């Protein structure tokens, strides 16, 4: 991808996937990065959406260094990303009896070996439902067919994952993860319960996870961020 286009996609400043060419490219392979949701017992979460750059590639290094050195660009990216995540939350709120809210977004950069990381961090209020002591994450991920990068969900401190759908590619203690482009849809759900401290029971999986083999269109609800964030919104 052209350097400027790569920068705009990574920093969520311009449209990415609503054109035919970009939509096809986004669908062919998962993006390098993660969406990490670290849940709290009250249903809030610390969320981090990251994009990764191969610093051994001159074009990608240039993009990362521009992001790393330009505070104004990072601030604009944080503002735009926050707007789009609030739009995601408002869409979910239409069908819920609780209100998802997105706090201020900060953009951080880091270098890990030969990888540059641009991370958007924010507080996500009420993203999970709380039923007695059960913490259930479904919306907004259940409203979309897939996510373009790895999704990682971490149970609240002192909790364990009781059940999850679809079956995760990784399940390690209080953490489950799916690779990018795994099919989610309305069956997506992660249930966490207080850890009894006894023998850990196997996590229940309601169905196997699959990844898209074709090229689904990127139909984000906005032309700014969701073309690269949420792929194939259900109608």
Where on the chain are the PLM-derived regions?
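Short, solvent-exposed secondary-structure boundary motifs
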Residues: 23-29, 91-101, 158-160
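Hydrophobic alpha-helical segments
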Residues: 1-31, 153, 203-235
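Hydrophobic residues positioned within well-ordered beta-strands of beta-sheet architectures
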Residues: 33-35, 45-49, 118-120, 149-151, ...
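Structured domain cores in non-transmembrane regions
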Residues: 57-122
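Solvent-exposed loop and beta-edge segments used for protein-protein assembly and interaction
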Residues: 29, 39-45, 110-116, 143-147, ...
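Intrinsically disordered, low-complexity linkers and stems that provide flexible hinges
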Residues: 108-111, 123-207
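N-terminal pre-first-transmembrane soluble regions of secretory-pathway and organelle membrane proteins
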Residues: 1-84
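Generic beta-strand hydrophobic packing signal
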Residues: 33-35, 105, 164
């Amino acid at each position: 991808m052209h350097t400027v286009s790569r920068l705009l996609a990574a920093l969520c400043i311009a449209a990415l996937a609503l054109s035919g060419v970009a939509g096809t490219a986004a669908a062919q392979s998962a993006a390098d990065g993660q969406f990490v949701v670290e849940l709290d017992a009250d249903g809030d979460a610390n969320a981090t959406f990251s994009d990764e750059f191969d610093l051994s590639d001159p074009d990608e290094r240039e993009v990362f260094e521009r992001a790393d050195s330009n505070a104004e660009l990072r601030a604009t990216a944080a503002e735009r990303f926050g707007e789009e995540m609030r739009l995601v939350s408002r869409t979910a709120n239409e069908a819920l009896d609780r209100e998802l809210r997105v706090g201020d977004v900060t953009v951080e950069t880091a270098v890990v070996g030969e990888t540059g990381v641009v991370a958007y961090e924010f507080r996500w209020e009420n993203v999970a439902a709380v039923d007695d002591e059960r913490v259930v994450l479904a919306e907004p991920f259940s409203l979309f067919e897939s996510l373009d990068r790895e999704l990682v969900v971490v149970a609240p401190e002192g909790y364990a994952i009781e059940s999850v759908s679809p079956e995760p590619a990784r399940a390690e203690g209080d953490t489950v993860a799916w690779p990018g482009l795994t099919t989610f849809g309305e069956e997506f759900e992660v249930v966490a319960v207080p850890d009894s401290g006894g023998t850990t029971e196997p996590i229940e999986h309601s169905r196997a996870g699959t990844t898209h083999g074709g090229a689904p269109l990127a139909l984000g609800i906005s032309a700014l961020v969701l073309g690269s964030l949420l792929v194939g919104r259900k109608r």
